[in-house]
């Protein structure tokens, strides 16, 4: 089924000076859930990530995520599989009221140094709906069949 009406919310991006010349974050296939984020590192000074080390990598953009949504920063499977490069704090949450540059906390879990070059696709962002709950304190938890069983209590 094809839907001909574009009712998707708009994601406004503000390009920062270090993002000049970079492609906009984009969905790389028709069915992609996440848009790829690119590294806004200095072209003359790529970032080399040694094994076991981590670094905060700029994207060059501020994301104005609509209220009622969040941005989830996630690893790219190819970088993880081929090089051991992943995102710490994954998924990292970008709140709708955050107005700073989106950065990616990359870690090298591989055995070799990895060079992050300008414009390289380093992570993906999934925009997802969120619900803020009304919080109330209760004297006791309600009864369920499962009860307090956790961490494998329903089987492995």
Curated annotation (Swiss-Prot):
<comment type="function">
    <text>This enzyme is involved in nucleotide metabolism: it produces dUMP, the immediate precursor of thymidine nucleotides and it decreases the intracellular concentration of dUTP so that uracil cannot be incorporated into DNA.</text>
</comment>
<keyword id="KW-0479">Metal-binding</keyword>
<feature type="binding site">
    <location>
        <position position="89"/>
    </location>
    <ligand>
        <name>substrate</name>
    </ligand>
</feature>
<dbReference type="GO" id="GO:0046081">
    <property type="term" value="P:dUTP catabolic process"/>
</dbReference>
<comment type="similarity">
    <text>Belongs to the dUTPase family.</text>
</comment>
<dbReference type="GO" id="GO:0006226">
    <property type="term" value="P:dUMP biosynthetic process"/>
</dbReference>
<dbReference type="GO" id="GO:0000287">
    <property type="term" value="F:magnesium ion binding"/>
</dbReference>
<dbReference type="InterPro" id="IPR029054">
    <property type="entry name" value="dUTPase-like"/>
</dbReference>
<feature type="binding site">
    <location>
        <position position="103"/>
    </location>
    <ligand>
        <name>substrate</name>
    </ligand>
</feature>
<dbReference type="Pfam" id="PF00692">
    <property type="entry name" value="dUTPase"/>
</dbReference>
<dbReference type="InterPro" id="IPR033704">
    <property type="entry name" value="dUTPase_trimeric"/>
</dbReference>
<comment type="pathway">
    <text>Pyrimidine metabolism; dUMP biosynthesis; dUMP from dCTP (dUTP route): step 2/2.</text>
</comment>
<keyword id="KW-0460">Magnesium</keyword>
<keyword id="KW-0378">Hydrolase</keyword>
<keyword id="KW-0546">Nucleotide metabolism</keyword>
<dbReference type="GO" id="GO:0004170">
    <property type="term" value="F:dUTP diphosphatase activity"/>
</dbReference>
<protein>
    <recommendedName>
        <fullName>Deoxyuridine 5'-triphosphate nucleotidohydrolase</fullName>
        <ecNumber>3.6.1.23</ecNumber>
    </recommendedName>
</protein>
<feature type="binding site">
    <location>
        <begin position="76"/>
        <end position="78"/>
    </location>
    <ligand>
        <name>substrate</name>
    </ligand>
</feature>
<dbReference type="InterPro" id="IPR008181">
    <property type="entry name" value="dUTPase"/>
</dbReference>
<dbReference type="InterPro" id="IPR036157">
    <property type="entry name" value="dUTPase-like_sf"/>
</dbReference>
<feature type="binding site">
    <location>
        <begin position="93"/>
        <end position="95"/>
    </location>
    <ligand>
        <name>substrate</name>
    </ligand>
</feature>
């Amino acid at each position: 089924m094809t839907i001909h009406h574009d009712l998707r919310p708009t994601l406004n991006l503000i390009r920062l000076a270090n993002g000049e010349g970079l492609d906009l974050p984009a969905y790389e296939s028709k069915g992609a859930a996440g848009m790829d984020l690119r590294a806004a590192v200095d072209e003359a000074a790529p970032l080399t990530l040694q094994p076991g080390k981590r670094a905060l990598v700029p994207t060059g953009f501020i994301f104005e995520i609509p209220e009622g949504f969040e941005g989830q920063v996630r690893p790219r499977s190819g970088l993880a599989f081929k090089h051991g490069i992943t995102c710490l704090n994954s998924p990292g949450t970008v709140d709708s009221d955050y107005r700073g540059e989106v950065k990616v906390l990359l870690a090298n879990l591989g055995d070799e140094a990895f060079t992050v070059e300008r414009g390289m696709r380093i992570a993906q962002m999934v925009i997802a709906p969120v619900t803020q709950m009304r919080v109330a304190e209760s004297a006791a938890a309600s009864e369920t069949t499962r009860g307090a069983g956790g961490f494998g209590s329903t089987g492995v």
